[in-house]
Every structure is written in C-alpha cells, then in structure tokens.
From Swiss-Prot:
Keywords: Cell membrane, Membrane, Transmembrane, Transmembrane helix, Virulence
PANTHER family recorded: FLAGELLAR BIOSYNTHETIC PROTEIN FLHB, SURFACE PRESENTATION OF ANTIGENS PROTEIN SPAS
TM region(s), chain numbering: 28-48, 80-100, 137-157, 175-195
Region (Disordered): 341-411
Subcellular location: Cell membrane
Protein's recorded name: Secretion apparatus protein BsaZ
The gene coding this protein: bsaZ
Cysteine pairs bridged by disulfides in the record: none
GO cellular component, one term: plasma membrane
Family: Belongs to the type III secretion exporter family.
Task performed by this protein: Part of the bsa type III secretion system, is involved in the intracellular replication of invading bacteria inside the host cell. Probably necessary for the lysis of the vacuole membrane and escape into the host cell cytoplasm.
Lineage: Bacteria, Pseudomonadati, Pseudomonadota, Betaproteobacteria, Burkholderiales
Superkingdom in the source lineage: Bacteria
Organism whose genome encodes this protein: Burkholderia pseudomallei (strain 1026b)
Amino acid sequence: MAEKTEKPTAKKLRDAAKKGQTFKARDIVALIVIATGALAAPALVDLTRIAAEFVRIASTGAQPNPGAYAFAWAKLFLRIAAPFVLLCAAAGALPSLVQSRFTLAVESIRFDLTALDPVKGMKRLFSWRSAKDAVKALLYVGVFALTVRVFAGLYHADVFGLFRARPALLGHMWIVLTVRLVLLFLLCALPVLILDAAVEYFLYHRELKMDKHEVKQEYKESEGNHEIKSKRREIHQELLSEEIKANVEQSDFIVANPTHIAIGVYVNPDIVPIPFVSVRETNARALAVIRHAEACGVPVVRNVALARSIYRNSPRRYSFVSHDDIDGVMRVLIWLGEVEAANRGGPPPETRAPTSAEPQARDGVAPPGDACADNAFPDDAPPGAAAPNAGSPDGPAPDGGAPARTGDQNA
C-alpha cells in the first residue's frame, strides 16, 4: 500500500464532512457551554422561588392535593430551569455547527453494522486518539487538584462564612461561590484545552491524508469529466455577447498574450488604412475570444510583447492602433498574406524588402507546422508571431485549398 503523504484536498474534506468526519474540539465546546452556564446561573437560577414555595405550603397548614402539589413543583422547575437549559443548548450547538462548517452529515445518521465490528473496536482502543484521551484525563485530574488548592486559598473565608449567613442569602452565596470555582477551573484548564485541540486537528488531518495515486485519480475525475469540460465551454461562450462575437469574426486576426489578453485587429483600406482595435478583452473573456476565434477560423497570433503594447497604448475598443504599434501590426498582416498566398499556390503579395534584422522566407513557403496546433513558423515570420500551417517544405498544399485560418503563434 502506498504511503499517504499528501494533504487532503478540498473535495476529500467535503466528502468526509458528509460522513460526519469533521474536526471536532469537543472540550472547547464543553468549555463554552460550562462558561455560559456559569455566567448565566446567577441571573437565571433564582433559589428564592423554591424557598417561597416551601413557605407557602407550610403557611397553609392544610393537606395539599398530591396532583396539584406535583404540578406546582413541575411548573416552578420549568420556570427556573428552562431558560438556563435552552441557553446552554444554544451555546453548545453554535460552536459545533461552526466546526462542521454548517454541513449536515446525513450519512452518519444511517444505521451501520460495521460499527459493531470488534476488530475495529480494538483498533480504536489502541489508537493514538485513545492515548491522547488517557493523557488528557490525567492532566484534568492535576488541573482540578490545582484549582481546589487555589480556590481554598482565595475563598476559604467566604466558605466558612456561610455558617453565619442569613437563610435568605444562603442560596445566592452558594451559587456565587460555585460559579467562581467553575470559572477558576476553566481558566486553569485552558492550556490543556488548547493542546487537546491542536492534537485533535493533527490527528484529523492525519486520518484523511491521501497518497499520490488518490490525488491524481481525484484530479482526473474532476478535470477529465466530459460534462465538466462541456459546462466550462458553455461558460466561456456565455462570457461573450453577440456583438463581441461578431467583432471577433470580422477581425483580420487576434493577437493574444497568450491567456490574459486578446486584442482583435481589423483593417479596411477602403475606409482608412490605419488598423483598428475591434476586440479588447482580458482574463476569462480573453480565453473566450481565443476559443471563438479558433472556432471561426480567425488567425490567433500569440505575441506577448505586441499584445501588451496594444493593450497599453489603445485603452479603448473601437480605437485606432497607436503609431508605436502600427509597424508590428503591419508585419503580422503582411506575413499572414504571404502565408495565404503560399497556401493558394500563387505569388506572394507585393511587400517591402525585409531588413537585415528580419529572417528571409525559404522558397516563399513556410515549413510544416506543429501537428497539435496546426501552426507553422515560416522563416519570414515577424518577431513574436507565427502562422497557420502553410503546407509541406517542398511547396504549397497539393489540393490548393483555402488558407488555414487558425493556429498558435509564438514569439
């Protein structure tokens, strides 16, 4: 069996929470409940009501009806105890829900016969958690002994003074001293509670650790699911309005960087010879633009420097390309025209002579592209750009088909 060394993933934690396996610091919940009860007891528990009931019964001097007598005591008990019990229940339920992240563990409610397995019971008996609980119990005994000693040193005069207290105040004084003892015990036990929570958190994550195969399998199930991929494609498509889709389809090419920026360039020499920014998107919308352009056959040029420059210098859509970027855009347009002409088998369009810094084309035809991306990297490609596959190294495509319109472009 492979060693479990990987931290549990978010999906693993969610699945475990549905089964009831969540991080539970039970002692911290108990601390909150006891502290809430101790602080609320002086205000909610009024023992003078009990004394008053005894006085009322004794003053009548008659034999009380047993039914009415029991009903009166039950009603008095509910009046005293109900607010106190409800407050303590709420104080215990809220931290438990926070620890479980408000997850309803439906599967843990089902009847499970495997819980009666004696082998599993023996494993739990000799587990790290059992050893932790044994050490914790010993620490609590020491904490209680320390609490009693400190309480006796601080409040021994008040305890012995109860013998001289008035009967009307005796119940209240007992409640006050009990609350002080409980709060002092909780204060002394606080380091043990924090240590117990830390060890419990460590054991919880240790039980849910995964091996590398489980992590890979979970990733494959979540990322490789066809329904999930289809849903993601739908989300990308929904990111684009019909207007932006039309602008992408009418663009001469899309320059990308390569996943965070997508700039559409449109040129119509009959109207104005300056290139025009038809699309300007970032992040998830940029990915959607690239996907739509590839689906429509619009060339996608992956040029980091040019995409960033146009995005920086052309701050709005439907604006002209800055004069600093016109040279780079025109190089891409000329190069795309040469590749399309080579694919058609005709002469390349009239272009200026390349400078010494530009690579020369080999026989006017680009070399074959990558089989995965259907791209080509011709020798006369402008810096930072690439083109669709233009054919074989010996010449244009034999079928004389239409030029390729999509592909990855790399600097």
